[in-house]
């Protein structure tokens, strides 16, 4: 029963509570219950994203938000036909991975990043199949501030090596490739190396995201409106940044999660994970574990850090439900 004091408080302050200003992000998920891949799953997920635009932040510039994106399954037919135009025949679905990569606009830095990625692929015994420029709508209205930060968007296609038999092993190799390439690129201390980022690298899923408004994601990324873009799942997120500034890499979804909330123990969690790096061991990752450090970075958002840790545990063999 509502007390007299509570009624008086409501009369004076209304239903608004400043305590709720900590987890305003919007997220949604749609899936075919039988796992059937269809294009309308993608369009329905994008519609959900449009319908939760009120959960994301918009600046004084109405074309600048905190970021939005979608995670879907690999659209094999789309990628297969597009890569065939370059003379590249992709292996069977599940036998190759796709890395979605944000690259610097500055040519020399971009070339250095691509070369380090190719070196990492070769070093891990996997096969570089080719690169693809991600088609985007350059005519879409975009905030000048967002346009200034807009990366070059490319996909790298990676075939499994002879030592990789099952898809889980390929996922682990892609994980190691992504981590080692990123570490090597940052070690170069390029002027624009901070503009390099890998939203996803997997044989199962791909992430399309950016410093976009909710209704811009499906317009900006032309792949998403292509009828060949089919998936049985669609995970979408519209960001309301609370503890980090809006940036292209910090948009959700991440590789494993999309999150509505704020993890206030993020610094402690990061430090604990950093401390554990010296004593961790994994029979699944074996010697590759040493190539993955650091697991996370101090200048990321709370969700990015959580995603890094969840990814490590999953790659080490823990069920995601555990």
Question: Where is each model-derived feature located?
Answer:
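Conserved short alpha-helical segments that host acidic/polar catalytic motifs at enzyme active sites
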Residues: 1-322
């Amino acid at each position: 029963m509502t007390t007299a004091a509570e009624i008086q408080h409501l009369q004076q302050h209304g239903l608004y509570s400043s305590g709720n200003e900590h987890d305003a992000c919007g997220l949604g998920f749609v899936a075919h219950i039988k796992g059937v891949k269809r294009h309308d799953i993608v369009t329905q997920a994008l519609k959900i994203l449009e319908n939760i635009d009120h959960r994301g932040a918009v600046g004084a510039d109405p074309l600048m938000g905190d970021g939005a994106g979608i995670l879907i399954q690999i659209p094999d037919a789309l990628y297969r036909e597009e890569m065939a135009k370059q003379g590249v025949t992709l292996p069977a679905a599940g036998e190759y991975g796709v890395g979605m990569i944000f690259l610097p606009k500055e040519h020399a830095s971009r070339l250095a990043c691509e070369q380090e990625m190719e070196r990492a692929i070769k070093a891990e015994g996997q096969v570089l199949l080719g690169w693809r420029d991600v088609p985007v709508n350059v005519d879409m209205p975009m905030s000048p501030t967002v346009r200034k930060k807009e990366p070059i968007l490319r996909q790298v296609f990676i075939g499994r090596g002879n030592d990789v038999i099952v898809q889980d092993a390929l996922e682990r190799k892609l994980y190691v490739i992504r981590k080692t390439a990123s570490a090597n690129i940052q070690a170069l201390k390029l002027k624009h190396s901070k503009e390099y980022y890998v939203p996803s690298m997997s044989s199962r899923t791909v992430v399309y995201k950016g410093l976009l408004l909710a209704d811009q994601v499906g317009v900006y990324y032309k792949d998403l409106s292509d009828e060949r873009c089919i998936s049985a799942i669609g995970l979408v997120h519209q960001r309301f940044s609370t503890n980090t500034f809006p940036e292209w890499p910090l948009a959700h979804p991440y590789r494993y999660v999309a999150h509505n909330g704020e993890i206030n123990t993020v610094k402690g969690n990061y430090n604990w994970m950093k401390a554990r790096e010296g004593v961790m061991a994994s029979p699944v990752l074996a010697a590759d574990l040493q190539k993955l450090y650091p697991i996370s970075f101090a200048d990321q958002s709370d969700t990015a850090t959580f995603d890094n840790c969840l990814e490590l545990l999953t790659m080490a063999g823990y069920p995601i439900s555990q």
